């Protein structure tokens, strides 16, 4: 097989060379004003969204379907002809607002809707890249994003586009004009509430109502994480569920039930406070900042809960107590939620009393798991920041399998399949500072808080039965610090410096068998991997790299088949769709995110990477389209 590649070039030079290769490259520059010229007129129905994982002409939901598998049945572009893939068009987001571009685009009725950094939305003609309209949200100065000014995507339903903002709003736009239909504030942005994840649509089987589901961000600033359900037509809240034990939920505008036990025994008592609980309980995190999956069969929303606040394990443990006695529910795990009421149906915790900021927000992929006994279980697949891959029964939250997907995990030896709990290694929870000192003794931990895999979503292939996991091999020095809550300030109580594990690589794209935990193949990258993954029926796996390459691999062997230099690092999930008989593949480009802000030695490693902001679309040239058919 032949590999087509381009050298590292400045973006303008790259665009010119790509034009010569493709013969059809359309470069479009963005503008800030909305323009009404969208060709999209057909409204999106729930049936469209429910079948998103089966259909090919649109991409309507984050994860490319409610199951979040990121697998496409398209095979026009395949392992035999992918070397012919060339740019169809590229759109520049424009102006100085670059930073991390982590958005997964959606596609409907010939229009690409892609969000950008600083809470922006662009509507583009899917065939030409022509700008149809732009929405620029006006952000206040006192926003508190923890991990860059990113936005991970939008949702679509009816005649509206929905997305969240860094000042804690959910906004509905007319999908044809970009004009605001409604705008709902859900939290105090000056206290750290933001929204970076893409909202999703689900249909409650009990009521028959379609609901718009979204979470909040802000664990690093001491928020209490909340999951919301809204009426997609009006934006009105239907219910809200907090993910810290003992905090009160809402249903139809009124207090409903507390999450778990109202006495919150998994958080220590403190008779000196107004609440009777330790300070951390009032600022306990658990924010579901990533997008939810939806199991229509069991009528369950399944979403990850974020890390507890603060990171410091001793702030969430009674004085002279044992952290293992205080699990900090309902944080750092996966939650099954009833869409009718917002009640918690089940909860599985990946990291009890999480001392390492492992969180639980990484995507939850719905798939059929076949165990060693041959029994098939409707399950979730989850590659956690803590370095372990989990298979959980999505009907009841019971653990089915767990195994490491990265090397040299130090904090735990394994996950006990009987108890479902990690078997921790001694000395990996950093000790309190000694009397008179402000900082505890550093401990070397792996994975570091940025995780064996972070938010960037993996893919599952229905053909190979493998998960394709974009992970990182690294470690950190980690130590405790004194911590007290102050509104709008970081609420961590930990210090850190991320370091290399290996000299020749950090990122690893790994294909793994969920039944056996076996590593089938891996591809190594010098820089951290922060892009998502796409798998297709064409025996292909696509992902992007920190140094700007968009790559395709053989799904069975891991052989690199094609790559293209986009001019800036890629930290987003790719998508694919079919239009007028041709397969298109798109990816958002622009380096940033958490690594250059929080990454220690890794931030130094990525300094040479250029920033950017653009959306690239690839296809096999139309004149060669016949040879692209299998």
State where each predicted segment sits.
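Gram-negative bacterial Sec-dependent N-terminal signal peptides
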Residues: 2-32
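Repeat-blade elements of multi-bladed beta-propeller folds
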Residues: 59-63, 98-120, 145-169, 194-220, ...
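N-terminal cofactor/phosphate-binding cores enriched in small/glycine residues
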Residues: 68-187, 536
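Extracytoplasmic beta-rich repeat domains
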Residues: 91-106, 134-155, 183-201, 221, ...
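Beta-propeller blade signature
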Residues: 173, 178, 225-236, 321-342, ...
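Loop/turn-rich, solvent-exposed surfaces of beta-rich toroidal or solenoidal domains
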Residues: 471-473, 501-559
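Blade-level signature of beta-propeller repeat domains, shared across WD40, Kelch, NHL, RCC1
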Residues: 575-630
């Amino acid at each position: 097989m032949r590999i087509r590649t381009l050298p590292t070039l400045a973006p303008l030079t790259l665009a010119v060379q790509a034009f010569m290769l493709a013969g059809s490259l359309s470069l479009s520059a963005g503008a800030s004003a909305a323009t009404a010229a969208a060709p999209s007129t057909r409204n999106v129905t729930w049936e469209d969204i429910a079948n998103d994982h089966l259909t090919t002409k649109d991409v309507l939901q984050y994860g490319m379907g409610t199951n979040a598998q990121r697998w496409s049945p398209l095979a026009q572009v395949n392992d035999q002809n992918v070397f012919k893939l060339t740019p169809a068009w590229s759109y520049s987001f424009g102006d100085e607002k670059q930073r991390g571009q982590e958005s997964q685009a959606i596609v409907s009725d010939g229009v690409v809707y892609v969000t950008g950094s600083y809470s922006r939305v662009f509507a583009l003609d899917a065939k030409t890249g022509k700008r149809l309209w732009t929405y620029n949200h006006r952000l206040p100065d006192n926003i508190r994003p923890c991990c860059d000014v990113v936005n991970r995507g939008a949702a679509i339903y009816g005649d509206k586009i929905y997305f969240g903002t860094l000042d804690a709003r959910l906004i509905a736009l007319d999908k044809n004009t970009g004009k605001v239909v409604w705008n709902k504030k859900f939290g105090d942005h000056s206290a750290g509430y933001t929204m970076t994840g893409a909202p999703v649509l689900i249909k409650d089987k009990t009521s028959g109502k379609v609901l718009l589901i979204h979470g909040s961000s802000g664990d690093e600033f001491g928020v209490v994480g909340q999951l919301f359900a809204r009426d997609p037509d009006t934006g009105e809240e239907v219910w809200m569920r907090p993910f810290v034990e003992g905090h009160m939920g809402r249903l139809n505008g009124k207090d409903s039930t507390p999450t778990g036990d109202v006495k919150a025994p998994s958080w220590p008592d403190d008779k000196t406070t107004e609440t009777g609980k330790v300070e951390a309980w009032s600022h306990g995190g658990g924010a579901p900042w990533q997008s939810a999956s939806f199991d229509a069969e069991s009528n369950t929303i399944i979403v990850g809960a974020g890390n507890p606040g603060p990171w410091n394990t001793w702030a969430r443990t009674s004085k002279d107590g044992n952290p293992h006695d205080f699990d900090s529910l309902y944080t750092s795990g996966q939650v099954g939620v009833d869409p009718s009421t917002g009640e918690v149906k089940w909860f599985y915790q990946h990291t009890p009393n999480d001392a390492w900021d492992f969180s639980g927000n990484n995507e939850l992929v719905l798939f059929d798991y076949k165990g060693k006994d041959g029994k098939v279980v409707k399950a979730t697949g989850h590659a956690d920041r803590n370095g372990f891959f989990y298979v959980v029964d999505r009907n009841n939250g019971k653990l089915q399998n767990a195994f490491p997907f990265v090397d040299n995990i130090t904090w735990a030896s394994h996950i006990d399949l009987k108890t479902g709990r990690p078997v921790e290694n001694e000395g990996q929870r950093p000790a309190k500072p000694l009397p008179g000192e402000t900082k505890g003794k550093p401990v070397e931990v792996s994975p570091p808080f940025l995780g064996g895999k972070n938010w960037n979503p993996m893919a599952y292939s229905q053909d190979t039965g493998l998960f394709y996991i974009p992970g990182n091999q690294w470690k950190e020095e980690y130590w405790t610090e004194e911590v007290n809550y102050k509104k709008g300030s970081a609420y961590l109580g930990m210090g850190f410096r991320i370091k290399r594990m290996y000299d020749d690589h950090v990122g690893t794209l790994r294909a793994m068998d969920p039944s056996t935990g076996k590593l089938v193949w891996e591809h190594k990258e010098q820089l951290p991997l922060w892009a998502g993954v796409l798998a297709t029926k064409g025996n292909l796996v696509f992902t992007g790299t920190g140094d700007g390459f968009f790559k395709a691999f053989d799904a069975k062997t891991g052989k690199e088949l094609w790559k293209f230099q986009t001019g800036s690092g890629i930290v987003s999930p790719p998508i694919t769709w079919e239009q007028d008989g041709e397969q298109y593949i798109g990816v958002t480009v622009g380096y940033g995110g958490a690594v250059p802000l929080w990454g220690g030695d890794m931030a130094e490693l990525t300094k040479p990477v250029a920033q950017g902001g653009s959306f690239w679309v690839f296809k096999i040239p139309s004149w060669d389209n016949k040879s692209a058919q299998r």
